[in-house]
UniProtKB/Swiss-Prot annotation:
Phenotypic consequence of N68Q: Disrupts interaction with TMC1. Disrupts mechanoelectrical transduction (MET) in hair cells
Gene symbol of the encoding locus: Cib2
Subunit: Monomer. Homodimer. Interacts with WHRN and MYO7A. Interacts with ITGA2B (via C-terminus cytoplasmic tail region); this interaction is stabilized/increased in a calcium and magnesium-dependent manner. Interacts with ITGA7 (via C-terminus cytoplasmic tail region); this interaction is stabilized/increased in a calcium and magnesium-dependent manner. Interacts with TMC1. Interacts with TMC2. Interacts with PIEZO1.
GO biological process, one term: cellular response to ATP
Protein name: Calcium and integrin-binding family member 2
Length: 187
């Protein structure tokens, strides 16, 4: 009796703790956030593991993502269905990877997916152009964009193939002291 939570079984909570950087309290807080996004869709009882997809259009309205120029790409990177719709597991994964406790390697893996717009497992000049357009709100002149993209490829392309593989990207991220402090969101 009493106020014991019944949103998840103890086993489910233990599994979430094992697979994320969160404790039980954080997981319950995340469920509350997920529920707030779509109260008519998200159940309060997850003990039977319902599969509910919250549409990307609702996810990107969260304060943590609303102003981010990569909000759709972030949500798509964590979406199992590839359309940006998130299950609770996807939602927890997104917050776990973007939390301050997640290691640089894990963050780099997802950052690479986010910046790989054409999903060819490389960051090519076109991907860099799209990244710059989002970061600068398309305020750079075309010749400036070309110059910046060429310089990034020149500096970061370790194997000289004209594009950045994950190893190139990871090396570049390792040299960016502010990557960890900027690639995160709080619950």
């Amino acid at each position: 009796m009493g106020n014991k939570q019944t949103i998840f079984t103890e086993e489910q909570l233990d599994n979430y703790q094992d697979c994320t950087f969160f404790n039980k309290k954080d997981i319950l807080k995340l469920h509350a956030r997920f529920y707030e996004l779509a109260p008519n869709l998200v159940p309060m009882d997850y003990r039977k593991s319902p599969i509910v997809h919250v549409p990307m259009s609702l996810i990107i309205q969260m304060p943590e993502l609303r102003e981010n120029p990569f909000k759709e790409r972030i949500v798509e990177a964590f979406s199992e269905d590839g359309e940006g719709n998130l299950t609770f597991n996807d939602f927890v994964d997104m917050f776990s990877v973007l939390c301050e406790s997640a290691p640089r390697e894990l963050k780099a893996n997802y950052a690479f997916k986010i910046y790989d717009f054409n999903t060819d497992n490389f960051i090519c000049k076109e991907d860099l152009e799209m990244t710059l357009a989002r970061l600068t709100k398309s305020e750079l002149e075309e010749d400036e964009v070309v110059l910046v993209c060429d310089k990034v490829i020149e500096e970061a392309d370790l194997d000289g193939d004209g594009k950045l593989g994950f190893a190139d990207f990871e090396d570049m991220i390792a040299k960016a002291p502010d990557f960890l402090s900027t690639f995160h969101i709080r619950i």
